[in-house]
């Protein structure tokens, strides 16, 4: 059985998709910056709220002691590596190509924040009365979901090779 080439292995659809996600990410972050109070929980539904904060580091505020330019260069190097992996991926691995698009969109979304604000805008908070998860943003979610799609593709490849 032949599988068709993945939509997002083609440059134009991939770039348009990434740009659309970047515009959405930046529009939300701008709205958060101008509308939400700093460090005040705005409940959305039980266990989910908006909570505006600034992240000077990377995931979970790690490396916040480093100069902003070091973090930007590090992120650009990671994006370059992800782009290289993407180009090495077989054209019929649809989930992997989608995953790489999501990761690159998310990474660039946070890099743009660094240049625009000097920090990354975080605003999504999962919580209960006694517990809360780290505050994150759409770009972080795109990176995580993208990694999930790449892992899914690897599992499917493994399953196909055994079948």
Curated annotation (Swiss-Prot):
One of its GO terms (cellular component) is plasma membrane. The keyword Cell membrane applies. Its main location: membrane. Signal peptide: none annotated. Pfam families: Peptidase_A8. It is a multi-pass membrane protein. The chain crosses the membrane at residues 4-24, 66-86, 92-112, 132-152. It is found in: Cell inner membrane. Keywords: Aspartyl protease, Cell inner membrane, Cell membrane, Hydrolase, Membrane, Protease, Transmembrane, Transmembrane helix. GO terms for molecular function: aspartic-type endopeptidase activity. Coiled coil: none annotated. Pathway: Protein modification; lipoprotein biosynthesis (signal peptide cleavage). This protein specifically catalyzes the removal of signal peptides from prolipoproteins. Belongs to the peptidase A8 family. This is Lipoprotein signal peptidase. The lineage of its organism: Bacteria, Pseudomonadati, Pseudomonadota, Alphaproteobacteria, Hyphomicrobiales.
